[in-house]
Amino acid sequence: MAVGLGPLPALHPVPGFELGISSAGIKRPGRKDVVVMRCAEGSSVAGVFTLNAFCAAPVILAKQRVQGTVRYLLTNTGNANAGTGEPGLAAARRTCEKLAQLTGVDASAVLPYSTGVIGEPLPVEKIEGALQAAIDDLSVDNWAAAATGIMTTDTLPKGTSRQFSHDGVTVTVTGISKGAGMIRPNMATMLGYIATDAKVAQSVLQDLIRDGANKSFNRITIDGDTSTNDCCMLIATGQADLPEITEAKGPLFEALKKAVFDVCMEVAQAIVRDGEGATKFVTVEVNGGGNHQECLDVGYAVAHSPLIKTALFASDPNWGRILAAVGRAGVPDLDVSKIDVFLGGVCIASQGCRATTYTEEQGSAVMAEEEITIRIELGRGDCSETIWTTDLSHEYVKINAEYRT
């Protein structure tokens, strides 16, 4: 059950960026599981990728090719093509070569992406057989269909759009994402595609998606597992009649940055809201850190704790588990007497122990809500970080126990 996640909003077409969807039947006959995306000539493309050492074959190829001329992005679901060694790389190359042959571009202009079961050979022939139908389906209006086509254990498609005006010209930013389990991106299984019709130099675009992902996709976690296949791509087609953005400054850049960051944040949080088996959307705020890293260490210690996550599922205000997680986060010379912890607006622990004003009824009322904020005040400095996560339910265990059956 997705928490606070409704139907897709209107996804505005991005001039110069087309999407086509078809069925290869990788896991189930008839399922739409191949997505082809076409970038207009002259587009800039940038991306951030998983830091998992066992990164998938398509990640290796996409990282090698992203700074060159990119015309097509090819995504398949149902098979991750990870843990497949040299045969996996050869398979990824073959699918790119087939798409290049069908579209008349160089194979190096095709970036591959895969998501699904790890360790199984990529069904190259099935994917090749579905490419022409996806090419024939290419349209700027296919964002919603593509958002569904990249899903795996997701229960709902995820996407959003932003538009702004500069010098009388409307600029569009639209993005989609997928992911519901194996989520702790570090650039789980997470894929994101964002496109704009602004014209942006590749170096500026790369910094933009790196910074945008760092404050959004890299601040979500469902189960703490970093996927072999994480990718988030940003494409600038340059079709808007505006000057090229060559520096990270100025009104046009700032407007684009805000739109891209907003899209990143919304589709990243949508992944958490649709987390496998999730019944709670949880914001973990850590304030008063001596540096940003210790805020993240504390936040992730709380967000990854199975004891806290199961208490959230049970709506049990077991505040001692939060204190224990903060204490084991590895923050050097942590003075627990300065720490305050809040559930929503309720102070549950102050100066390292139970707050004198706290009652179980107050805590239970907060924990019964679908959206919960855990706020931790460290009292060590001025740094803050925010992480978004879920509870841990019976359904999460069931989904992952039955994933390959």
Swiss-Prot record:
The record marks 115-116 as: Involved in the stabilization of negative charge on the oxyanion by the formation of the oxyanion hole. Substrate binds at residues 152, 178, 189, 276, 400, 405. SUPFAM superfamilies: DmpA/ArgJ-like. Heterotetramer of two alpha and two beta chains. It catalyses: N(2)-acetyl-L-ornithine + L-glutamate = N-acetyl-L-glutamate + L-ornithine; L-glutamate + acetyl-CoA = N-acetyl-L-glutamate + CoA + H(+). The keyword Coiled coil does not apply. GO terms for biological process: L-arginine biosynthetic process; ornithine biosynthetic process. This is Arginine biosynthesis bifunctional protein ArgJ. It comes from the Bacteria. It is found in: Cytoplasm. It comes from Pseudomonas syringae pv. syringae (strain B728a). Keywords: Acyltransferase, Amino-acid biosynthesis, Arginine biosynthesis, Autocatalytic cleavage, Cytoplasm, Multifunctional enzyme, Transferase. GO terms for cellular component: cytoplasm. GO terms for molecular function: glutamate N-acetyltransferase activity; L-glutamate N-acetyltransferase activity. It is an enzyme of class 2 (transferase). Catalyzes two activities which are involved in the cyclic version of arginine biosynthesis: the synthesis of N-acetylglutamate from glutamate and acetyl-CoA as the acetyl donor, and of ornithine by transacetylation between N(2)-acetylornithine and glutamate. Belongs to the ArgJ family. The active site is at 189 (nucleophile). Pathway: Amino-acid biosynthesis; L-arginine biosynthesis; L-ornithine and N-acetyl-L-glutamate from L-glutamate and N(2)-acetyl-L-ornithine (cyclic): step 1/1; Amino-acid biosynthesis; L-arginine biosynthesis; N(2)-acetyl-L-ornithine from L-glutamate: step 1/4. The record marks 188-189 as: Cleavage. Its EC number is 2.3.1.35, 2.3.1.1.
